Amino acid sequence: MMIRERIEEKLRAAFQPVFLEVVDESYRHNVPAGSESHFKVVLVSDRFTGERFLNRHRMIYSTLAEELSTTVHALALHTYTIKEWEGLQDTVFASPPCRGAGSIA
């Protein structure tokens, strides 16, 4: 199973999202092809109601602790309640460009 699929599976089980998108953005960074190390996650769930963004991120980090301790280097997290998501009208901001130094030969 690919890392992206494992991330999706764990997040679906933990948060029962109404919307979930996991995008492998590793190609945008200074890593070898096929690294599966940088991901963007858009997660919409009522589990976030009443939670600050920092705690929402901690909830995800806890869920993905194994992946973060091994293969996943970075997560760009976009976490919303259903009400917040409706207010955004399905608009999600793009991840910033890589600021890593050097290049992979």
From Swiss-Prot:
Keyword set includes Lipoprotein: no
Gene induction: Induced during the transition to the stationary phase, under the control of the sigma factor RpoS. Also induced during early logarithmic growth in response to several forms of stress (heat shock, acidic stress, oxidative stress, carbon-starvation stress and osmotic shock), and this induction can be partially RpoS independent.
Signal peptide range: none
Example of a GO cellular component annotation carried by this entry: cytosol
UniProt keyword Cytoplasm, yes or no: no
Keywords annotated in UniProt: Activator, DNA-binding, Repressor, Stress response, Transcription, Transcription regulation
Gene Ontology biological process terms from the UniProt entry: cell redox homeostasis; DNA-templated transcription; intracellular iron ion homeostasis; iron-sulfur cluster assembly
Stated family: Belongs to the BolA/IbaG family.
Protein name as annotated: DNA-binding transcriptional regulator BolA
Organism name: Escherichia coli (strain K12)
Gene behind the chain: bolA
